[in-house]
Amino acid sequence: MLHPRARTMLLLSLPAVAIGITSSLILIMVMKIASVLQNLLWQRLPGTLGIAQDSPLWIIGVLTLTGIAVGLVIRFSQGHAGPDPACEPLIGAPIPPSALPGLIVALILGLAGGVSLGPEHPIITVNIALAVAIGARLLPRVNRMEWTILASAGTIGALFGTTVAAALIFSQTLNGSNEVPLWDRLFAPLMAAAAGALTTGLFFHPHFSLPIAHYGQMEMTDILSGAIVAAIAIAAGMVAVWCLPRLHAMMHQMKNPVFVLGIGGFILGILGVIGGPVSLFKGLDEMQQMVANQAFSTSDYFLLAVIKLAALVVAAASGFRGGRIFPAVFVGVALGLMLHEHVPAVPAAITVSCAILGIVLVVTRDGWLSLFMAAVVVPNTTLLPLLCIVMLPAWLLLAGKPMMMVNRPKQQPPHDNV
């Protein structure tokens, strides 16, 4: 016979697996549709019209029209495509299901149109809303927070293709007690994350790791170098933190989201022309291209880091529906490669991983997620002790500093962005 603790853990196992699978399928569906639309906008259509896909007019035109299209969705869809991600944490309160169609359409348009945001925030929002709405009907005795955690864990597992990220993130959220051990509380979320990761793996494998030279034995000077790199990345990120609420307030003085997002798309187009096609989109495929291109110089990497960080701020301030983690990782990779080119004595594995750690820490203020992203992009077990040590001064630097979020105006309804 099972112990009562085991029966309690098994109670949510089936719902957790179902939520994990569903979370992954929703992510896959959105990414597939966005990929088809992206291919149409950036490959087939310019080819049919005889226009180069990296033509300045095409880049500016597509991003401007993308902004207008997203603005129309936000303006006229029921629920106004959910909350403004610039004002929300990664894992927030559930939104009304009526806002989900508009949110999904706005996300797909942004991903396909080249906006410098990832899918993580809207996908988590969609899955939380569905899990809470359906779960409350099927199992009303389970509280909303449990459904929120399961949906978040399932989505994180699906996004990163592993349960490790969910385990790290929720280990600090689900604080155990003497009565309920931590791993008892982690059981159902990890089931959801595992189901999400395995389902994603059936269709595609998220490819985060970069072909960077292997790092051998750790030396004391490497710790100092890594801490300096992380501090530089944090400084760059804090510039974005300072700019975001000010640009957001300035742009949203115009009350019509069609105008706001149209102007935001136009600015993103100009940034895309300066940075080139590699500076567009969410950044994961593009950072692979950036590493593979041996022709980039120190100034090229610096330009890409600045352009991508500016595009991230503009996209978030404009109200595009998307997350900030994936483009932040791109910025970290560009900064790391730039610093390695500038000081070749410091291994690229250190500069890239520590830059990712610093910039993701600024964006998420989550130490575990920052460590995970740094370790998964530069997969090298020798780096793990160094990253854990570098995290300490990085965390001290950010203690008490403002987060990369905008304080929502009190007069603005929580899910109304008109």
UniProtKB/Swiss-Prot annotation:
Its main location: membrane. GO terms for cellular component: plasma membrane. It is a multi-pass membrane protein. It comes from the Bacteria. GO terms for molecular function: chloride transmembrane transporter activity; monoatomic ion channel activity. InterPro entries: Chloride_channel_YfeO, Cl-channel_core, ClC, ClC-type_chloride_channel. It is found in: Cell membrane. Signal peptide: none annotated. CDD domains: Voltage_gated_ClC. Keywords: Cell membrane, Ion channel, Ion transport, Membrane, Transmembrane, Transmembrane helix, Transport. The keyword Metal-binding does not apply. The chain crosses the membrane at residues 10-30, 54-74, 99-119, 120-140, 149-169, 186-206, 223-243, 258-278, 300-320, 322-342, 343-363, 371-391. It holds the Pfam family Voltage_CLC. Belongs to the chloride channel (TC 2.A.49) family. This is Putative ion-transport protein YfeO.
